């Protein structure tokens, strides 16, 4: 049977099967199976090495977005610059990695501004500093924002937004998450706030923040539907 899957850990919460099955139905694709597969850094090499011709694609979530990269035959230049892969496409025996988070974030911001009939943001704060934050940095660069503030518990490391910034040619200003007043000050000053944090982590900040008119907020968490 032809199949695709979302891989990561934990994976039981993922709505990727619902999204993809709905898309397939719209496209008239029938007879394909979409799976949730629990995979982590330890199990990933064996899983990737065992993929057959019946697999048509993988959606990749944490903690596999960076771990999968050395296991692939080819990586799209944007995904290499970001330092994270969220989509794997097998073709003629070649496994290629891509990053669609960048386009998704940029498109969401453009759509929000278009619906509100407002100009694109000129400044931004990113909450978090790992793989999705790196994608957000690249998306902001596409929107013309080349200097962003990043608030996180820690910075650094090969998979961090700090490392991605140098590859992407953008600049970041670092604010420690523990410095609540500094984070709030940064949040009040920018046009756009992008949270790449797990569900609930940004709630204390959201409860202290008075969103000003025209400010755009993007939370990558999609479950629950409404976040703080």
Task: Indicate residue ranges for each PLM-predicted region.
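Phosphate/diphosphate ligand-binding glycine-rich loop within oxidoreductases
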Residues: 2-115, 224
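Short beta-strand elements in bilobed, periplasmic/extracellular small-molecule ligand-binding domains
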Residues: 29-37, 147-149, 170-174
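N-terminal Rossmann-fold NAD(P) dinucleotide-binding loop
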Residues: 133-134
């Amino acid at each position: 049977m032809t199949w695709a899957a979302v891989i990561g850990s934990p994976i039981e919460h993922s709505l990727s099967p619902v999204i993809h099955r709905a898309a397939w139905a719209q496209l008239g694709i029938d007879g394909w199976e979409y799976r949730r597969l629990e995979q982590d850094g330890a199990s990933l090499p064996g899983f990737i090495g065992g993929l057959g011709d019946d697999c048509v694609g993988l959606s990749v979530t944490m903690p596999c977005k960076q771990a999968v990269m050395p296991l692939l035959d080819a990586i799209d230049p944007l995904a290499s610059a970001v330092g994270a892969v969220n989509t794997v496409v097998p073709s003629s025996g070649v496994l290629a990695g891509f990053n669609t988070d960048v386009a998704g974030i940029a498109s969401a911001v453009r759509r929000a501004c278009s619906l509100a009939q407002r100009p694109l943001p000129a400044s931004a704060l990113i909450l978090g500093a790992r793989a999705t934050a790196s994608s957000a940095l690249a998306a902001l660069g596409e929107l013309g924002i080349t200097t962003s503030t990043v608030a996180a518990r820690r910075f650094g490391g090969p998979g961090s937004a700090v490392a991605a910034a140098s590859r992407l040619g953008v600049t970041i200003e670092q604010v420690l998450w523990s410095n609540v007043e500094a984070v709030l000050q940064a949040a009040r000053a920018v046009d756009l706030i992008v949270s790449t944090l797990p569900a609930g982590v940004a709630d204390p900040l959201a409860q202290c923040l008075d969103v000003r008119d025209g400010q755009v907020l993007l939370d990558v968490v999609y479950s629950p539907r409404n976040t703080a």
